[in-house]
Regions:
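Conserved protein-kinase N-lobe ATP-binding Lys motif
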Residues: 7-8
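C-terminal helical cap(s) of enzyme catalytic domains, especially alpha/beta-barrels
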Residues: 136, 152-175
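Long, low-complexity, intrinsically disordered segments
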Residues: 175-188
Length: 188
């Protein structure tokens, strides 16, 4: 799935839905392979209009997500009234989840709440195996972040697509992190 983040200007463009419909037809793109993202701040504004646009986007077959959830514009009303498929939990909740029980409790509660709304939950900004372990414990659906890779050049990304190399690299990284945890220090 490729995510496309819509700007404020784009979401209010009266030709947006027609553009999406024509583009998927012209290039024979499966809309199920594309997720349309709106930031939380945008979704929390004109919820009735945003809800209308999201319904139109979904009617074309796209999935939709609310991005950066929890960074100051949190609106339970927005996730209640707008039919998003995915909620992306902001990195600020993940940064200290392994050392702060309050953060862990909050993340657990948000995951439970969002699952109750039949939405898929992704944690953004996951950087290490310890965070992954804690998030798995709370039934998180998926992660994104430096845990997998830092931003890459095209050639590096293409090399990552070789599944075996990717899995080998993650297994090696996880084993190193586990040894550090057991020893209580850093290992290079």
């Amino acid at each position: 799935v490729v995510s496309v983040n819509l700007s404020r200007r784009t979401i209010y463009d009266p030709g947006l839905i027609k553009f999406f419909a024509e583009t998927i037809q012209k290039y024979d793109v499966d809309p199920k392979s594309i997720e349309i993202e709106l930031t939380e701040s945008l979704a929390a504004q004109d919820t009735s209009f945003i809800s209308f646009v999201i319904r139109k986007i979904k009617s074309l077959g796209f999935s939709t997500s609310i991005d950066d959830f929890g960074i100051g514009y949190s609106s339970l009303s927005a996730i209640k009234n707008i039919d998003f498929d995915v909620l992306k939990l902001d990195k600020s909740f993940i940064d200290d989840v392994e050392v702060d029980k309050t953060s862990e409790s909050l993340v657990s509660s948000i995951i439970s709440l969002v699952h109750g709304l039949k939405m898929f939950v992704i944690a953004e900004g996951v950087e290490n195996p310890s965070q992954v372990s804690i998030l798995k414990k709370h039934d998180l659906d998926a992660i994104q972040g430096y845990y997998f890779a830092k931003p890459l050049e095209v050639s590096e990304f293409e090399a990552l697509l070789d599944h075996n190399k990717f899995e080998e690299a993650k297994t090696k990284e996880t084993k190193k992190a586990n040894r550090r945890t057991k020893k209580g220090g850093d290992e290079k």
